[in-house]
């Protein structure tokens, strides 16, 4: 166990690829958008590789089938409107929490630790998705990619979350599946926890100091298992 875990006062989570598997609905929205624009569909695995930087960036990547290129502005605008319209209406058709998500959240909540969601997804969509999945009540704070002037990998959302929760950011844990989560956590000065069941490749990310998480877990209850002895000691 990382020594820093002894000082944890709040836990923040990424959403897509950490709390839930949302790719099926994200991919369905991409397929609907491409069909409306008269373009060929992309495999769900390709769409999965494009997730993590917000829907605006996802639309660019899907339209160009390239992680780094941007689509023509007029095409992007049409695509974005189409994507958002479909996705808003189909947020949780196939999206489900990962098997041990709710158990892990309930265990952490039992310790009296405030929980937050820090995602690059639009805040309204994130809040509605959590509500539809029955997870919203676990969280004291939900921050989306459009909640603040900067999003992950900027440390700003993490620092803001800590401020709202009334704790030092060094006493917060950021749990996620992507480089954005880990880079943001390191820049903010808090503990980074990588999950092995999401969309990011933790083995690959761990090879680089900049994206190596402080701790890797295979299920959310593992966080509780490490925090619970500490909380018992404090009592």
UniProtKB/Swiss-Prot annotation:
Q: What does this protein do?
A: Specifically catalyzes the dephosphorylation of 2-phosphoglycolate. Is involved in the dissimilation of the intracellular 2-phosphoglycolate formed during the DNA repair of 3'-phosphoglycolate ends, a major class of DNA lesions induced by oxidative stress.
Q: Which InterPro entries match?
A: HAD-like_hydrolase_sf, HAD-like_sf, HAD-SF_hydro_IA, HAD_sf, PGP-like_dom2, PGPase_prok
Which Pfam families does the record associate with it? Hydrolase
**Matches recorded under HAMAP family:** GPH_hydrolase_bact
Q: Does the keyword Cell wall biogenesis/degradation apply?
A: no
Q: Name the coenzymes or cofactors required.
A: Mg(2+)
Natural source organism: Neisseria meningitidis serogroup A / serotype 4A (strain DSM 15465 / Z2491)
UniProt name for this protein = Phosphoglycolate phosphatase
Pathway in which this enzyme or protein is active: Organic acid metabolism; glycolate biosynthesis; glycolate from 2-phosphoglycolate: step 1/1
Which keywords does this chain's UniProt record carry?
Carbohydrate metabolism, Hydrolase, Magnesium, Metal-binding
Residues annotated as catalytic: 14
